Structure formats: C-alpha cells, structure tokens
Amino acid sequence: MFSFFISLAVLIGGYFLYGAFVEKILDIDESRKTPAYTMSDGVDYIPLPTWKVFLIQFLNIAGLGPIFGAIMGIMYGPSAFLWIAIGTIFGGAVHDYTSGMLSLKKNGASLPEVVGDQLGNGLKQVMRGFALILMILVGAVFVINPAELIAGMTPSSLDTQFWIIAIFVYYILATLLPIDKLIGNLYPIFGFALLFMAVGIFVILLGHLEYIPEFTDGLHNRYPNSESHPIFPMMFVSIACGAISGFHATQSPLMARCIKNERLGRRVFYGAMVVEGILALIWAAAAMAFFKGSFADLSSYLGEKSTAPLVNEISTTWLGSLGGFLAILGVIAAPITSGDTALRTARLITADFLKFKQNTVIRRLVISIPIFLASYLIMQINFQILWRYFGWCNQALSVFTLWAVTVYLARKKKLYIITLIPALFMTMVCTTYIVFAPEGFTFDNLISVWIIDKFPNMNVFTVNYTICVGIAILVSTIFYVIFHKKVLKQSKLKE
C-alpha cells in the first residue's frame, strides 16, 4: 500500500515542483506567437482548445506501454513502482516537455529536424530514417492487440483479420484528414474513456491495497527465470511508455503545432506524461491485486495467455459489463490512437525531408500509401519479435532526443544536467540491452565467455555490465567531446 501511494505522491508532487523548475530553465515567453498562428495551414497547424490538445497528446503517447508494459513490468517487483515514479518525473516528462518546447520554438518542426539542429546534419539524416522506421513499427505493433480485443467482443464472423483491416481504414482517414476534423473530435471521447477506466480501476483497487507489494519486501526480481529477465536493463525497456519513451518526442511536434501559448507547454507535455505514469502505476498495482499478491500466479497467467486477456478479465470482473466495456474501449483506444498519429508523423517526416507540400489529399496520399504498405507487411512478422525490437528502438530514440536537448541547453548556457543525467542513464540501458539481449548482439555468448574462461572468479552478469558500462561511457564521451565542445565553440564565435 505505502509503496503505491508514495509513488503516486512523487508523480503528482513532481509535476508541480520539478515541472515548474524545468519550466523556468526553458525561458517560456507568453507573448511570442506559437506556430498554430504563425504557420496556420488548416491541416496540421491549427489552434485547438487546451483541453483538446492535452487529451490528444495523452492519447498519442499512451500506447501499450502504460497498460501492457506496466503489467509485465510489475513482475520485477516493487522496483517497477520506483522506476515508474522516478523515471517519469526526471526522465519521461522532462524528455516530452523539452522536446515539445524545442519543436514549438522551431515552428513545430518534426523530431529529426530538432535533433539535426543541435547534433548536425549527419545525425539529422540518421534520425529521419530511425524515426520513420519506428513510426512504421508503431503502426504495425499497435494494431494487433486492439484487433484481438475487439474480435473477442464481437461475433465470430468478425475475426481479428477483419478488425485489422478496419483499423487500417481508420488509420488512413486519420492520417489524411485535417487534424481538427477526425482526431480533434474523436480523441476527446477516447480520452475520457481511458481516464474513466483508470479512475474505475483505481477506485476498486482501494479495496485490495493489502495485495500491493511494498518496498520493504525488497526490490529483488520476482521473475521465476530471473537470469533471463534481469531488472537492468529489461525492466526499463519493458515498461517503456510507462516511464520514458522516445516515441513521445515524435508525437509532441503534432501538438506543438496546435498549442495556443508557450505557457501551456508544461500542462500539455509534462502533464500528459505524468498522467501516463499514474496510469502505469494503477495497472501495475491492479495486476498484483487481481492475483492477491501472487507473483507466481501472475507469471503463470502471462505464460499461458497474454496481457490482453488479463486486461479484459480485470476490467469486466472489477467494473461489470458496462464499466468493463468502457474500460476496454479506453484500452483499445490507447494503442489505436498512438498508431494513427505515428503514421501521420511518418507522413510529415517524409514530407519534410522531400519538401513535399501536404495541402491536398492527393499529395498526402502520395506519401501515405507506401508507408501504409510497409506497416502492413511488417505486421506479418511474429508479434513477440516485433515488440522487442520496437521496445529497443523506442528507448534508443529517447537517447538521441535527450542528447539533442542537452546540447541545446548547453548552447543556451542553461542547466543542462536536467537532461544530461537521463541521457547518460538511458544510453547505458539501451547499450546494455542491445549488447547481450537475445534479440541483440548476444555478446554474452562471445566476449563474456572468453573473459570468464580467463578469469573464472567473475560471473557472466558482472562481465556483461562492465562491458556495457564501458561502451556507454565511450558513447557518452563521444557525444560530449564532439558535440558539446563544438556547440560551445560556435556560441563563442557568435558572441
């Protein structure tokens, strides 16, 4: 109980205290006109009410991570609560807020443009390709689970394949139409459904507080096969959007083009991430409470079935048929609304690169059709493999974004430590994961075996972490020396 409420207090208090601190560093200017007015085009640059901007941003970023990722993440024990709270306030919310404001200050530029502006043209091109691949992956990954959930609620004649096609038809409309026509009108409904689900699950959770794991129980791993699921780095990749996600930085420019005033940035970008962290916290606790605090039962269920049926079962058992339906609607809406804006972002990134105007439907179709085809083809790959690669790509993108913001703050002679520390940490997470994860380079089967043969007193985890810390330090040093010194030199020349 206490671990849950302490984490909740950190999230809420962090928004008001640390969020305000970050806001001061960013030099917010309320008198400066935003891109919604200076770049208005009736399609992507449109001033929207703040409540709509918040709900759209929240739905854009709240994909599978804060629900499915949080449920898988709680298998690592109370450490998941700790990471969701601290990771959100000092990592994810700062990442989303700073990247959103950099985009806003650069006329609503897409993420590759923002990164390239700080780290150079070479990395801009890398980021364009990287972000485009991630957006297409999101479009594919965030279709399968919603389609399965809807298929389970409808007649057998409307199978999963039917709903996959239906969702893709919706994606096409959401990608092509002006943002205020479909997304601006539909998202608030989905947003309220998602918030209703979170509040409903939270209220029921209050009657099962004794089953929520405590920090005093120990922060050790609860996975039965913990050696193949080490807390570091696996937990930080699994929880993903529930604490920090590079995908969010690709979505923030969409709302940077619709926000009416710079002062609203903290409410929209930082606030939406904090709400997502609260959502992740609720679902992590709910999964444990549903199985009466038994990690073994939760692990067994996830092994036999998956997270989607569990979400359905918790919702209908706790909230009844009507409440369960609204809850499932929110769960379905979260990934679908992330998928559609991901493909919209892919269109905008491609159009920015080609300098291809998007003022007519035909011109938008020219860019969109190849993107949709690629996303549909990728869906034919096994979902578990897709999800793991998505998870790593997602967090790797946050590394690029955090380093870009760090360089920006250094150039402005601001307190860049607020993004430097998260950048260093996430660099180590992503490096460690890709170096010895089964879907990565699996260096633990190569280098570490050789080292242990020479030094038998060392174990495989010590070797792996030492290698990865070394690589992370090397990567960080390269960023610091090449980019940090370069931009400071440029700043001196301008002075």
Model regions and ranges:
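Extracellular loop-to-transmembrane helix junctions
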Residues: 1-19, 73-103, 112, 465-473
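Helix-loop-helix module between adjacent transmembrane segments
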Residues: 10, 91-107, 111-176, 240-244, ...
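Membrane-interface "cap" regions at the ends of multi-pass membrane proteins
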Residues: 10-67, 234, 261-264
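Flexible loop linkers connecting adjacent transmembrane helices
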Residues: 20-46, 70-72, 78, 94-123, ...
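Hydrophobic, membrane-embedded alpha-helices of multi-pass small-molecule transporters
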Residues: 48-65, 202-210, 219-283, 329-338
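Loop-to-transmembrane helix boundary motifs in multi-pass membrane proteins
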Residues: 121-128, 132, 160-165, 271-280, ...
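Hydrophobic alpha-helical segments and their helix-loop junctions in multi-pass secondary transporters
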Residues: 139-165, 174-175, 194-222, 408-416, ...
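Extracellular/periplasmic helix-exit of transmembrane alpha-helices
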Residues: 205-216, 270-313
